[in-house]
């Protein structure tokens, strides 16, 4: 019996998503205007934030762009925010958007070099705990100089490479033949068990790398986008930022690596999966075949990619241009010197990041609602009202951490540093207290936010990437796997803020490593940014 037109509309709405999910989204769309107009705009704002987090949590059922986008469009239509404010948010975050558009595509053209290096690491280190430490440390080191999103893009492209090599051979095809690694139909039962273990193995490595980006990203002013904003407000340069953060970031870094080692050894929270022998064998064979088949042309490509990688790190560490523009230069150099000149070959590189870029634009429209409806104001006011300076530092760290778990840490960091800047300009706090609070804000936004994928853009990118469903990495799984790290990073960070920050900073002043700032540096950024 043919489907009626009404049923066809319902069937088409959000496609293959389960019916309960469709009903949930439709009911959100009906409830929001009612709450906004007849109950309280503030309540409606928080309701929208919770609903948006729900769409992120269900990313494996339906990509969050569609449901989240519908919620955002309705929010703008009923006046929770304005198109101007959304545009203002996008303009303020243009560097992050450029980064996603160009840098992630640039990394795509560095794939051969990355696979070459990481295959050596993966096959060279037999111990899973040491391998995890290597991934975590490498991600942390890179994130101190590059953006966390760039580092995660590198790790994702490597993991997809590894996954597809094994999947191809397990499906009975040669290493070099074309293959769709998203379909499991051709696998025998024996290889399925290996595949599950291999997925668990890749999941744990990706989570270690993800947390690594947070460990490294908090230490320097180029590590995360909000660090730049905070450094700019406080007029700190690279060296001073590093030193001022050290009392908190160094203990956290050491404890983070210890946690990485511990969860692998104890095999808890979904960690501890070893690389199955069959898979190792296939990867070793792949490496041998690659070495045999490598022509001078391939070697030349690896050299070119190596030189471009050097330019990438130098360009980013010295901030020679906006991150996205350096990414664009990587695309141009890599394609020009490796001979990729057809338009359709270029298009593939952009497939991974553009859906996420669109999702981030929707995310910023939710942020615009948070700003216009002043959703965080009660929390911020309560913390600024605390008289005792030491308590105020701890409260700032905790409040920042909690808000960063539900909202984007770039946004939370920006809102807080603006409020504190305003307090400084109005003479409510001293310049020295402002400098200490800036450390509390930076560490508060960067460390506890590993708890959920909405806190860290790098985690969100990983969750919504094409790789996540392949290795069965869901929102809930990420939260559970991040839990030991969340607890350790948040508590050690708090310990650093309460007990180490003030005495260490005083010692740095006495030693002449940093100097007291006078006056209020630059004026607070306008609006939400």
UniProtKB/Swiss-Prot annotation:
Topology versus the membrane: Multi-pass membrane protein
Give a single Pfam family match. Answer: NhaB
Cellular compartments per GO CC: plasma membrane
Q: Taxonomically, which superkingdom? A: Bacteria
Q: Catalyses which reaction? A: 2 Na(+)(in) + 3 H(+)(out) = 2 Na(+)(out) + 3 H(+)(in)
This protein's UniProt keywords: Antiport, Cell inner membrane, Cell membrane, Ion transport, Membrane, Sodium, Sodium transport, Transmembrane, Transmembrane helix, Transport
What GO annotations for molecular function exist for this entry? sodium:proton antiporter activity
Report whether Zinc shows up as a keyword of the record: no
Which residue ranges run through the membrane?
13-33, 34-54, 90-110, 113-133, 136-156, 205-225, 241-261, 306-326, 327-347, 351-371, 451-471, 479-499
Family recorded in the similarity comment: Belongs to the NhaB Na(+)/H(+) (TC 2.A.34) antiporter family.
HAMAP family noted in UniProt: NhaB (MF_01599)
Instruction: Supply the name of the protein.
Output: Na(+)/H(+) antiporter NhaB
Species of origin: Vibrio vulnificus (strain CMCP6)
Instruction: State the taxonomy lineage.
Output: Bacteria, Pseudomonadati, Pseudomonadota, Gammaproteobacteria, Vibrionales
């Amino acid at each position: 019996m043919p489907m009626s037109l009404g049923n066809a509309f319902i069937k088409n709405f959000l496609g293959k998503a389960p019916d309960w999910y469709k009903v949930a989204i439709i009911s959100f769309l009906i409830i929001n205007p009612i709450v906004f107009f007849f109950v309280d705009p503030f309540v409606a704002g928080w309701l929208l934030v919770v609903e948006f987090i729900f769409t992120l949590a269900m990313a494996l059922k339906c990509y969050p762009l569609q449901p989240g986008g519908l919620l955002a469009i309705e929010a703008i239509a009923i006046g929770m925010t304005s198109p101007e404010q959304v545009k203002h948010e996008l303009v303020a975050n243009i560097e992050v958007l450029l980064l996603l558009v160009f840098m992630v595509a640039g990394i795509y053209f560095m794939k051969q070099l990355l696979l070459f290096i990481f295959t050596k690491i993966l096959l060279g280190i037999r111990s899973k705990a040491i391998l995890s430490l290597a991934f975590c440390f490498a991600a942390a080191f890179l994130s101190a100089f590059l953006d966390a999103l760039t580092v995660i893009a590198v790790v994702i492209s490597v993991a997809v490479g590894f996954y597809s090599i094994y999947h191809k051979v397990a499906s009975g095809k040669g290493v070099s033949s074309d293959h769709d690694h998203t379909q499991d139909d051709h696998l025998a039962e024996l290889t399925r068990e290996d595949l599950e273990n291999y997925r668990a193995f890749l999941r744990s490595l990706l989570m270690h790398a993800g947390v690594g980006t947070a460990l490294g990203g908090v230490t320097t002013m180029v590590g995360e986008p909000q660090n730049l904003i905070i450094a700019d407000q406080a007029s700190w340069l690279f060296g001073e930022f590093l030193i001022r953060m050290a009392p908190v970031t160094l203990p956290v870094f050491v404890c983070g690596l210890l946690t990485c080692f511990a969860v692998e050894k104890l095999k808890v929270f979904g960690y501890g999966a070893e690389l199955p022998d069959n898979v190792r064998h296939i990867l070793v064979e792949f490496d041998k075949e690659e070495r045999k088949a490598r022509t001078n042309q391939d070697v030349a490509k690896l050299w070119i990619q190596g030189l471009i990688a050097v330019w990438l790190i130098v360009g980013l560490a010295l901030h020679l241009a906006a991150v996205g523009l350096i990414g664009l230069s990587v695309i141009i150099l890599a394609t020009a010197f490796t001979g990729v000149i057809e338009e359709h070959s270029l298009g593939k590189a952009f497939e991974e990041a553009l859906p996420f870029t669109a999702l981030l634009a929707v995310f910023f429209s939710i942020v615009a609602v948070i700003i216009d409806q002043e959703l965080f104001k009660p929390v911020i006011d309560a913390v600024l009202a605390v008289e005792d300076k030491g308590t105020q530092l701890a409260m700032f760290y905790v409040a920042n951490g909690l808000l960063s778990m539900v909202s984007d840490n770039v946004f939370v960091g920006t809102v807080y540093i603006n409020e504190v800047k305003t307090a400084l300009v109005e003479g409510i706090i001293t310049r020295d207290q402002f400098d200490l609070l800036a450390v509390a804000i930076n560490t508060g936004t960067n460390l506890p936010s590993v708890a959920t994928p909405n806190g860290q853009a790098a985690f969100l990118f990983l969750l919504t990437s094409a790789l996540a469903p392949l290795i069965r990495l869901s929102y809930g799984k990420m939260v559970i796997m991040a839990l030991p790290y969340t607890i350790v990073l948040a508590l050690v960070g708090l310990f650093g803020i309460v007990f180490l920050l003030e005495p260490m900073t005083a010692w740095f002043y006495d030693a002449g490593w940093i100097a007291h700032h006078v006056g209020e540096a630059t004026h607070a950024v306008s609006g939400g940014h």
